[in-house]
From Swiss-Prot:
<keyword id="KW-1133">Transmembrane helix</keyword>
<keyword id="KW-0812">Transmembrane</keyword>
<feature type="transmembrane region" description="Helical">
    <location>
        <begin position="173"/>
        <end position="193"/>
    </location>
</feature>
<comment type="function">
    <text>Plays a role in cell envelope biogenesis, maintenance of cell envelope integrity and membrane homeostasis.</text>
</comment>
<feature type="transmembrane region" description="Helical">
    <location>
        <begin position="145"/>
        <end position="165"/>
    </location>
</feature>
<feature type="transmembrane region" description="Helical">
    <location>
        <begin position="100"/>
        <end position="120"/>
    </location>
</feature>
<protein>
    <recommendedName>
        <fullName>Inner membrane-spanning protein YciB</fullName>
    </recommendedName>
</protein>
<feature type="transmembrane region" description="Helical">
    <location>
        <begin position="46"/>
        <end position="66"/>
    </location>
</feature>
<feature type="transmembrane region" description="Helical">
    <location>
        <begin position="74"/>
        <end position="94"/>
    </location>
</feature>
<feature type="transmembrane region" description="Helical">
    <location>
        <begin position="3"/>
        <end position="23"/>
    </location>
</feature>
<dbReference type="GO" id="GO:0005886">
    <property type="term" value="C:plasma membrane"/>
</dbReference>
<dbReference type="InterPro" id="IPR006008">
    <property type="entry name" value="YciB"/>
</dbReference>
<keyword id="KW-0997">Cell inner membrane</keyword>
<comment type="similarity">
    <text>Belongs to the YciB family.</text>
</comment>
<dbReference type="Pfam" id="PF04279">
    <property type="entry name" value="IspA"/>
</dbReference>
<keyword id="KW-0472">Membrane</keyword>
<keyword id="KW-1003">Cell membrane</keyword>
Length: 202
């Protein structure tokens, strides 16, 4: 349930983009009604998908708050970023802002991990996971560095796809490419950690 909830905005963004692209006339009319004239039919899918992503993230925050009585800081950050960059895309009718949104989020997360470790001597990855697993301090440090490196690279990769390929290719990458890479990263991390968990058990 949590995994699906985490992916909800990305999934709905993808679905909305595809549905809007399949009905260009209706999509264009809808966007023109709410955002005004001067919008080309080709802009409608990304604008509709952006509005859906903002609404989905708001719903995500509300669901988490109703279920748990609190909301994680990174989810608040995600809501702030999608509202700011998605809102700019809707106001200025420019997809550049929403294309930068994943990169800003990835780099914000990587930056928080790095600053916390360097300035405050706090390992945020350890803080997130230590209730579930026990690891030696050097392993926690390597894990923190791996997360910083991975999310920094993901930020660059998002920009590469956004500016090097078509808008539709970027939308596909957001769901399948980025999520696939994250899954591979966490699976690889699991294999790496399993060795240290076995050693700790011995």
């Amino acid at each position: 349930m949590k995994f699906f909830l985490d992916l909800l905005p990305v999934i709905l963004f993808f679905v909305a983009y595809k549905f809007a692209g399949a009905a260009p006339d209706d999509s264009h009319a809808l966007v023109a009604q709410f955002l005004g004239a001067g919008i080309s039919p080709s802009q409608a899918p990304i604008l509709i998908a952006t509005a859906v992503a903002i609404a989905a993230t708001l719903a995500q925050v509300l669901i988490v708050w109703l279920r748990h009585g609190k909301v994680d800081k990174m989810l608040w950050v995600s809501l702030a970023i999608i509202t700011l960059f998605g809102g700019a895309t809707l106001v200025f009718h420019n997809p550049t802002f929403i294309k930068w949104k994943p990169t800003v989020f990835y780099w914000t997360f990587a930056g928080a991990l790095a600053v916390s470790a360097l300035l405050f001597r706090r390992n945020l990855v350890q803080k997130m996971l230590e209730a579930q697993i026990r690891l030696p301090a050097p392993v926690w440090q390597r894990l923190n560095l791996a997360w910083i490196g991975f999310f920094t690279l993901m930020g660059f990769l998002n920009l590469y796809v956004a500016y090097g390929y078509s808008e539709e290719a970027w939308v596909n990458f957001k769901l399948f490419g980025a999520m696939g890479l994250m899954l591979a990263f966490f699976l690889g991390q699991g294999f790496y950690l399993s060795r240290h968990l076995e050693e700790d058990a011995k």
